[in-house]
Amino acid sequence: FVSSQPQYSALWRVIESEVVPLSKKEGIGQIVWSPMAQGILTGKYLPGKKAPAGSRATDKKSGADFISRWMSEEVLTAVQKMKPIADGLDISMSQLALAWVLQNSNVSSAIMGATKPSQVKENVKASGIKLSADVMQAIDNALGKLPERDPKKNESPNPRA
């Protein structure tokens, strides 16, 4: 089995236009990381509120610099528009984010981080969730133009430069 390990989430879609089509053609699956956009898609970060103490967004060792791109009021407000979608399906925001990623036929698996066993139990349930085309469209509508899609952002820096 050959796979690629790119970043991929409802907010970070840079692999969709070039990597995914080529991978499908060549029989390469995706084992994606950051399917919940560093926790942003869990809904725990709220517009107008400070990030919870001890969260990834407040801890430099856990990637506070990396997550900062998603900590704008615009992004957090859009993500909260996904809550009624999750509620309507009787699933958590985390499960919705993971199910969205796993809906891509080229995604073989998703690497998720968890700080508690309960998070693992909750997130594993996403593997059995199938989202309808209407739900997928509702997620796209909620996020609007926010998802990053520029394939140039998928390039690795040249180590010899």
Question: What spans do the regions from the language model cover?
Answer:
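Terminal-tail/helix-coil boundary detector
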Residues: K25, K49-L89, Q103-S108, T115-A161
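Aromatic-lined glycan-binding groove of carbohydrate-active enzymes
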Residues: I15-A57, S92
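Active-site beta-loop-alpha junctions enriched in small/polar residues
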Residues: Q7-L11, P35-A37, T115
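Glycine/proline-rich, positively charged
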Residues: F1-E18
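Structural preference for beta-strand elements that scaffold enzyme active sites
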Residues: F1-Q5, G29-I31, S108-I111
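Conserved, mostly hydrophobic/aromatic
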Residues: S4, S23, Q30-W33, M82, ...
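Conserved active-site loop/cleft motifs that coordinate metal ions or position small ligands
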Residues: S94-A97, S109-G113
